[in-house]
């Protein structure tokens, strides 16, 4: 990182971008090639990115890869199987589209953004700690596939209603802390509801 880069174009021969490659610059424009399959940890963290178009063959996005930018949206509908922890933390993301090949939404992926609604696909079985905390979420539909909600996963939003399906096994601590919940439907067979899961709602 040199704090001077503002625009980059990834060559067609590049399949993998390693860790920290463009960390902490002033990049506001990226042209990805269609052969790119993997983006490393913190590769584009701490830049000025407002928009990105991820290539169709992309499979993996590393931890904090796009954290601390100015992104307004995230389209993860390519071939993406894994999005690392805090990959899009601290942006301005108001809309997100998920891949149907993802099974886990990891820790802090969209923490501290501007999301008002999300469509969680039916293949997601686990949502990690603080994955969607500190957003503007109002509407939330829990898919039948969801088994585990991590700590603080939806804390500090504006959610007013949650309806869990029978498959849910664990609701982590502080999962819905600091929302606007008026109604919660919890199935009888749930194994674990941890401390402060629904605390501090008004």
Protein language model regions, located:
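Structural signature of tandem-repeat unit edges
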Residues: 2-16, 26-38, 48-60, 70-82, ...
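Consensus positions within tandem repeat domains that build extended binding/scaffold surfaces
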Residues: 18-21, 40-43, 62-65, 84-87, ...
């Amino acid at each position: 990182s040199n704090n001077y880069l503002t625009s980059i174009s990834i060559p067609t021969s590049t399949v993998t971008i390693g860790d920290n490659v463009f960390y902490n610059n002033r990049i506001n424009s990226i042209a990805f090639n269609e052969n790119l399959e993997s983006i490393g940890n913190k590769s584009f963290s701490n830049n000025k990115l407002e928009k990105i178009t991820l290539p169709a063959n992309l499979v993996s996005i590393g931890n904090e890869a796009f954290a601390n930018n100015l992104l307004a949206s995230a389209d993860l509908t390519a071939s993406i199987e894994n999005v690392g922890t805090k990959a899009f933390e601290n942006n301005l993301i108001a809309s997100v589209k998920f891949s149907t090949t993802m099974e886990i939404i990891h820790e802090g992926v969209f923490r501290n953004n501007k999301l008002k609604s999300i469509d969680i696909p039916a293949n997601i079985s686990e949502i990690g700690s603080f994955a969607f905390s500190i957003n503007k979420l109002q509407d939330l539909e829990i898919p039948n596939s969801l088994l585990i909600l991590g700590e603080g996963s939806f804390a500090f939003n504006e959610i007013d209603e949650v309806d869990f399906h029978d498959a849910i096994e664990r609701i982590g601590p502080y999962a819905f802390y600091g929302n606007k919940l008026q109604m919660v439907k919890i199935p009888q067979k749930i194994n674990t509801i941890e401390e402060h899961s629904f605390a501090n709602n008004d």
